[in-house]
């Protein structure tokens, strides 16, 4: 899967599926599920590294996990999902050169074929244009942007006409800057539908209604592996509970075997 193929999927009216992965096991599961895109999201800071936000994760950690994702795939390269890696907090907000170095490292040394950036500030748009000129595909991200949690929080975005008009303008700027797709998170379905209709590039929703060109979800949320999930990403199974019950069964069985062994007559010790 290549970035340009996602636009063709939009034109064909076929929904685009994006799931996150953070190691080899999760990558193998997502690949087997048939997802179009694997996102190595900075959400791994919370899912895999137990941080409270996405902010602490570094470029080096993103590279480490993206390499693991690549090793988890089992299909030949042409049949593998497109891998998009998040550029973490402060890896692209501090200048174009730093952003190029971070994105270039991810594409050179891992299976990533594209990067994702949050926001549409003038500085971010300049970074996107620079990356695209250098041959690095970029996915945009508007709405609830976790890297701006201390400024915006985790609340729903673009709920009034003024902010919706601003989001539409930003989305068009991201498309003009060269983004091949756009994620919109935790926004009203009406604005997501408007973006999908007015943009040529695919609009991928998460908590943005069903009228987008595709959907993205955190795999651990869908599997019920996280302690809690956002309202727009309810689990399909109670994976955490199932795993705990399976492991408890193993521990219980082992303890019972040990108890049985201590109550039976032990054979005489061999002479050494």
Curated annotation (Swiss-Prot):
This is 3-methyl-2-oxobutanoate hydroxymethyltransferase. The keyword Magnesium applies. Catalyzes the reversible reaction in which hydroxymethyl group from 5,10-methylenetetrahydrofolate is transferred onto alpha-ketoisovalerate to form ketopantoate. 3-methyl-2-oxobutanoate binds at residues 42-43, 86, 116. It comes from Prochlorococcus marinus (strain MIT 9313). The active site is at 185 (proton acceptor). It comes from the Bacteria. Its cofactor is Mg(2+).
């Amino acid at each position: 899967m290549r970035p340009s193929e996602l636009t063709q999927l939009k034109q064909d009216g076929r929904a685009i599926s994006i799931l996150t992965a953070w190691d080899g096991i999760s990558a193998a599961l997502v690949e087997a599920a048939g997802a179009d895109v694997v996102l190595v999201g900075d959400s791994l800071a919370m899912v895999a590294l137990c941080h409270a936000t996405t902010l602490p994760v570094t470029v080096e950690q993103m590279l480490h996990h993206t390499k693991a994702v690549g090793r988890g795939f089992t299909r030949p390269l042409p049949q593998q999902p497109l891998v998009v890696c998040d550029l973490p907090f402060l890896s692209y907000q501090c200048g174009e050169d730093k952003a190029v170095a971070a994105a270039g490292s991810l594409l050179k040394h891992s299976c990533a074929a594209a990067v994702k950036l949050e926001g549409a500030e003038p500085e971010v748009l300049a970074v996107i244009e620079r990356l695209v000129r250098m041959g690095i595909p970029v996915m945009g991200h508007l709405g609830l942007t976790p890297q701006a949690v201390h400024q915006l929080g985790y609340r729903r975005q673009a709920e009034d006409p003024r902010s919706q008009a601003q989001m539409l303008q930003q989305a068009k700027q991201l498309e003009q800057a060269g983004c091949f797709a756009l994620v919109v998170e935790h926004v009203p379905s009406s604005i997501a539908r408007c973006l999908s209709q007015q943009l040529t590039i695919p609009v991928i929703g998460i908590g943005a209604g069903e009228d987008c060109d595709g959907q993205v979800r955190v795999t651990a949320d869908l599997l019920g592996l996280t302690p809690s999930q956002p309202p727009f990403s309810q689990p399909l199974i109670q994976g955490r509970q199932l795993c705990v019950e399976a492991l408890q069964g193993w521990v219980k069985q082992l303890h019972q075997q040990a108890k049985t062994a201590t109550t039976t007559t032990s054979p005489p010790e061999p002479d050494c």
